[in-house]
A protein has these predicted regions:
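Sec-dependent signal peptide recognition
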Residues: 2-10
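Hydrophobic h-region of N-terminal signal peptides that target proteins for export
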Residues: 10-18
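Serine-esterase "nucleophile elbow" of acetyl-processing enzymes
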Residues: 18-76, 86-95
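Catalytic His-Asp segment of secreted/periplasmic serine-dependent ester chemistry enzymes
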Residues: 21-23, 144-227
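Solvent-exposed loop/turn segments at secondary-structure junctions
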Residues: 41-45, 75-81, 105-110, 145-149, ...
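Proline-aspartate-enriched helix->loop->beta-strand connector
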Residues: 91-101, 105
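Active-site segments of SGNH/GDSL-like serine hydrolases
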Residues: 102-106, 129-162
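Charged helix-capping and loop-helix junction motifs
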Residues: 115-124, 157-162
Length: 227
């Protein structure tokens, strides 16, 4: 009986999260917001800073200097199974106001042998666990760029994993930040142009972060009237 009551309470908390204020509403009211970015090398280190730094700068410019801070809590080469294992220490312990998740590109890495079904379970677990542990935390899912060259060969079914992210965002009622179409337009200009943004064929550089990724994040999270 206690177990059933606990589960019902947890579900109630998760459901009420849909009606709570989000990142922008809190910034408008002058509340400091800490964003945790959780994912692969595309969201970590120099790659992550390439787009999170301008995103944070723009939000601070609009809503108040130093209101927005962020932590890059992911790790290069990791995938959603690692994400589940390290969620408590890397994300929940930081009590974030918003979390941006992306593991799709490495879930698709064939050597990790992570099926779309397992990746979906991992992603849904992370969303549910964050909602249960950190009330009022807004969650965003990211679909990143396509790789080219040998990096693409290691991920023959990447489209299926990215499709799962889109489906999960809709199912869970979280905001999807889908960069894929923008990167397709860059790639349509030719591989040489694409590599000016993604030199090694998989990791966007500072130019890619600032010119392709950051503007679309702001477009998705800011109210339409403020763009």
């Amino acid at each position: 009986m206690r177990k059933i009551i606990g589960i019902m309470c947890g579900l109630l908390i998760a459901l009420t999260a849909y009606g709570q204020k989000g990142l922008i509403e809190h910034l408008r009211s002058g509340q400091a917001q800490h964003i945790v970015v959780y994912g692969t090398s595309l969201s970590s280190g120099a790659c992550g800073n390439a787009w999170m730094r301008p995103v944070a700068a723009e939000l601070n410019k609009r809503y108040g200097d130093s209101l927005v801070t962020y932590t890059l809590a992911g790790k290069g080469g990791m995938w959603s199974t690692w994400g589940v294992t390290h969620l408590e220490d890397s994300v929940i312990a930081k009590k974030p106001d918003a979390v941006i998740i992306e593991f799709g590109i490495n879930d698709a890495f064939r050597d990790y042998q992570t099926s779309v079904a397992v990746a979906r379970l991992n992603l849904e677990y992370m969303i549910d666990r964050i909602r249960l542990s950190v009330q009022d935390c807004e969650i965003f899912l990211q679909v990143m760029n396509m790789p080219i060259g040998k990096s693409a060969g290691f991920r023959p079914h990447l489209a299926d994993y990215y499709a799962m992210y889109r489906e999960t965002a809709q199912k869970k009622g979280v905001t999807l930040i889908d960069h894929y179409a923008n990167w397709e337009r860059v790639l349509e200009q030719g591989e040489a142009i694409f590599r000016t943004y993604v030199p090694d064929g998989i990791h966007p550089n500072t130019k890619g972060g600032e010119q392709i990724i950051a503007p679309h994040i702001l477009k998705r999270i800011l109210p339409t009237t403020s763009l």
